[in-house]
Amino acid sequence: GFTNPATLSARTYTLIAFHEFENAQKPGGVESSFVMQRCLHCLEPACVSACPTTAWSRQSDGPVRYDEDECIGCRYCQLACPWDVPTAEWDSLAPKISKCTHCNDRVGQPVPTAFNGQAMNDNETKRFTGSIETPACVKACPADALRYGTRDEMLALAHKRIADRPDKYIDHVYGEKELGGTTVLYLS
């Protein structure tokens, strides 16, 4: 296919997969779509439930986090995840599990007042704040299709988009109820 890399891996946390399917109403009889595959940061995460240690936890603000120092390498999390998201570093002598971190190393961090020893002006502070307030995938999305906020904010936005454009979207927010709900939601 056209997707590169083909699957999630210890170094690929988010995958945009290209899919083609038959549609007799489209020119050439084929339609295509792009589907994002990544950790959905479940409300009731199977990886957390399956872990015999405290390597996995769900944070109150939504993200499912992994602590490699607590991991014993059993990989039960891989077996439990319905989306096959946690992946092992198979090329390592002591493989750890890897997945989307929800950019926990940057989201919500305090904004510095200086950069490279120079005090930042208001415009620089605003630009810097904008870059650390959202996960990298949201910041980098060239189609501006991704949004970031609380689950309630995102559900409200999703339902508004469906109501505003019923011709464009299927009347369903994926992740609202599936497997107990997720903090990452999809429209199609």
Regions found by a protein language model. Give the residues of each.
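Non-ligating segments of multi-cofactor redox enzymes
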Residues: G1-S188
